Swiss-Prot record:
Belongs to the mitochondrial carrier (TC 2.A.29) family. Gene3D superfamilies: Mitochondrial carrier domain (1.50.40.10). It is a multi-pass membrane protein. Mitochondrial S-adenosyl-L-methionine/S-adenosyl-L-homocysteine antiporter. Mediates the exchange of cytosolic S-adenosyl-L-methionine, the predominant methyl-group donor for macromolecule methylation processes, for mitochondrial S-adenosylhomocysteine(SAH), a by-product of methylation reactions. Solcar repeats lie at residues 4-77, 85-167, 176-264. GO terms for molecular function: S-adenosyl-L-methionine transmembrane transporter activity; S-adenosyl-L-methionine:S-adenosyl-L-homocysteine antiporter activity. Disulfide bonds: none annotated. It catalyses: S-adenosyl-L-homocysteine(out) + S-adenosyl-L-methionine(in) = S-adenosyl-L-homocysteine(in) + S-adenosyl-L-methionine(out). The keyword Repressor does not apply. The gene is slc25a26. This is Mitochondrial S-adenosylmethionine carrier protein. It comes from Xenopus laevis.
Amino acid sequence: MERRELCASLLAGGAAGMSVDLILFPLDTIKTRLQSPLGFSKSGGFRGIYAGVPSTAVGSFPNAAAFFVTYESAKRFLGSDSSYLSPIIHMAAAFLGELVACLIRVPSEVIKQRAQVSPSSTTYQMLSVTLREEGIKGLYRGYKSTVLREIPFSLVQFPLWEFLKNLWSWKQGRAVDCWQSAVCGAFAGGFAAAVTTPLDVAKTRIMLAKAGSGVANGNVLFALHEIWRTQGIMGLFAGVIPRMTMISLGGFIFLGAYDKVRSSLL
């Protein structure tokens, strides 16, 4: 990838990611509290819906930038003229992008979610408590579950987004506009969000679990089994509506803004 393309992907991805995370933060807080083992009301209800936003503000730009730089680089490296291989290339690029991005995302996500369900505590207090009680390892609690959530999500979202853009482009006989890319992103994101909600619930429970508990060990299958045993199908899909709404809107803003900013920089 040329230096100009690299910079364009970095800036476009970072700007798009920060915009989405900050605009939709209240919906993310509501979703997290619905998924909390304490329940929605005890986790804060509708109070302090911006609790944990400093963690997001710090982590969202480098997280999204890392994903898109890796994603675009991998697409270029793995590029093929065969249309049949395109979905596989997009999946592989998304997989690599998530592995890199999660190294930045997880510490930010851990502190953010703990602050979201403890609105009386500040982000700095949550960071201090986590480091004091669990060390650096505590910041990466749920790394495996986050990767196991994000990779299936991206394997659905990004190939579907690229497919819808290509289909729309073929139908109208020209490249899609940025708003059309955004619409494709909304559909792709909403669908991917719905089918991966159980993994998102498991990830939230692992990150919020008390140190030393069975769920806190990071075993996703154990967490899913516990949720199913205690709450059934409703527990596995807790927060699915705000998650779908948030990610559909996020897909519209994020992928539309990414294409717009990147094209304007190239």
